[in-house]
Design a protein with these regions (language model features):
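Active-site neighborhoods of divalent-metal-dependent phosphate/nucleic-acid chemistry enzymes
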Residues: 74-116
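Acidic, PIN/NYN-like endoribonuclease modules and their adjacent C-terminal/linker elements
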Residues: 1-3, 71-74, 105-135
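A generic structural signal for short hydrophobic patches within well-formed alpha-helices
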Residues: 11-12, 45, 122-123
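Hydrophobic helix-cap positions at the C-terminus of alpha-helices
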Residues: 27-31, 68, 91, 107, ...
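Short, well-structured N-terminal submotif of metal-dependent ribonuclease cores
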Residues: 1-40, 53-66
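Histidine- and aromatic-rich ligand-binding microenvironments
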Residues: 6-7, 40-41, 96-98, 119, ...
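Extended, non-globular alpha-helical segments
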Residues: 63-71, 76
Length: 135
């Protein structure tokens, strides 16, 4: 089973019906069918929440949270995973990555998974992790 990490960029594109939404929807269908495992760091979940709250409202952010909960995506906590947090901190210290993006990259590295994103900021780690580029 292929394992993929979704960056917040991918889910925001899906929810806002941007050009990459169709590719993300295909991944979600594969996860539902059991052929792919999709992961999302809780830090990136929080990024989706706060972006929605800033742009729309807290009510809209809560709705988006419910929608994510209904998808076949495993939310990955960071509270007890110092290996994951350490890798994110290394990426943040050595690359030009936002902190939340560093968690998505670290999760992909630690789980040996492909990161699915369209955020060009991840070019910083392209040689270190597998990236599935969305357009």
């Amino acid at each position: 089973m292929a394992t993929k990490v979704l960056d917040s960029w991918a889910l925001i594109a899906f929810f806002e019906d941007e050009p990459a939404a169709e590719e993300v929807e295909k991944l979600l269908m594969k996860a539902e069918a059991g052929t792919h495992k999709l992961l999302l760091s809780v830090v990136n979940w929080g990024e989706i929440y706060y972006n929605t709250m800033r742009k729309v409202s807290q009510e809209a952010a809560e709705q988006k949270a419910r929608e994510i909960a209904g998808l076949t995506i495993e939310l990955v906590p960071v509270e007890a995973d110092l290996h994951l947090v350490r890798q994110a901190a290394i990426y943040k210290a050595t690359k030009k990555l936002a902190y939340a993006d560093a968690f998505a990259a670290a999760l992909a590295k630690v789980r040996n998974a492909e990161l699915v994103t369209g955020d060009q900021e991840f070019k910083e780690v392209e040689g270190e992790i597998k990236i599935g580029w969305l357009k």
